Each structure stands twice: as structure tokens, then as C-alpha cells.
Design a protein with these regions (language model features):
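Non-catalytic signal-transmission and effector/linker regions of two-component phosphorelay proteins
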Residues: 1-14, 119-134
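Alpha4 helix (beta4-alpha4-beta5 surface) of REC/receiver domains from two-component response regulators
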Residues: 73, 94-115, 121, 125
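Two-component/phosphorelay signaling modules centered on CheY-like receiver
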Residues: 22-40, 108
């Protein structure tokens, strides 16, 4: 796949990244913007929730472990505002995601997570995979 094709992939797609690590949100947003996505970021879950625009984002990427409100709580609140929004989780611990999913979020696909740390090519691949999944 050439770079021009990769840059066109994200055109017209809007992403929201919510993670309490500012460096991570900057790196991810720059990488995804390079590939043509429009990206908004927040480093605070409550601020993200209050600024969330229903029917606007094609994909929301949430960190799981955040202060104030964790990613699963934020997921619930976002779904109340926009039940159709696609959400995936960003986590350093696949095991933590899987345990929590089995315990309280059975309906979540076990593949709706992106593992930290991640390089730009893997990030693009995972975002495209999740966005095209049913």
C-alpha cells in the first residue's frame, strides 16, 4: 500500500481520542491526521464527555485506566448520548480489558482494543480494522 493511498483512507473520517497521557494523544493524533483522519483529543474523561458531539465521530478511542472516570464508565456515558458510535479501547493490558469485558460488558467484541504501546502503522491498521468491522 503506498502512502498516497494510505492518506486517502482516512478522508472524511472523524476520530476522538481520549487518554490521560497528553504525549500519547499528540502522537496518535499526528499519525492519524497524516493518514487523512480528522482527530479531536481530550486528556480528561469528564471534559471529553461534556464536549462530545453525538452523530459526529466515526470512532472513539478510549484509554481504560484514567482518573475521574475510567474508559468503561465513559463508554456507558457516550453510548447514552450516541448509541451508534463505534468505540474501541486503548490499553497496555489486554488481560485487564478481557477480564472486565467478560465480567460486565459481554456484548463488547473481544477485539475492540488497541494495545499500547503502538507504532503508527499498527495504529492505522487497527483503526481501519475496527472501523470496517460490523
Amino acid at each position: 500500500m503506498n502512502r498516497h493511498h494510505e492518506q486517502q483512507q482516512g478522508q472524511q473520517k472523524r476520530l476522538l481520542i481520549i487518554d490521560d497521557e497528553p504525549d500519547l494523544t499528540i502522537i496518535c493524533s499526528l499519525a492519524l491526521e497524516y493518514y487523512g483522519f480528522t482527530v479531536d483529543t481530550f486528556n480528561d474523561s469528564e471534559e471529553a464527555l461534556s464536549n462530545f458531539k453525538p452523530d459526529y465521530y466515526d470512532l472513539v478511542i478510549l484509554d481504560i485506566k484514567m482518573p475521574k472516570m475510567d474508559g468503561f464508565e465513559l463508554y456507558d456515558e457516550l453510548k447514552k448520548k450516541d448509541n451508534d458510535v463505534k468505540v474501541c479501547f486503548l490499553t497496555a493490558s489486554e488481560l485487564y480489558y478481557e477480564e472486565f469485558r467478560k465480567k460486565e460488558y459481554h456484548a463488547l467484541d473481544k477485539r475492540l482494543f488497541i494495545r499500547k504501546p503502538i507504532d503508527n502503522e499498527d495504529l492505522l491498521k487497527e483503526v481501519n480494522r475496527i472501523m470496517t468491522s460490523a
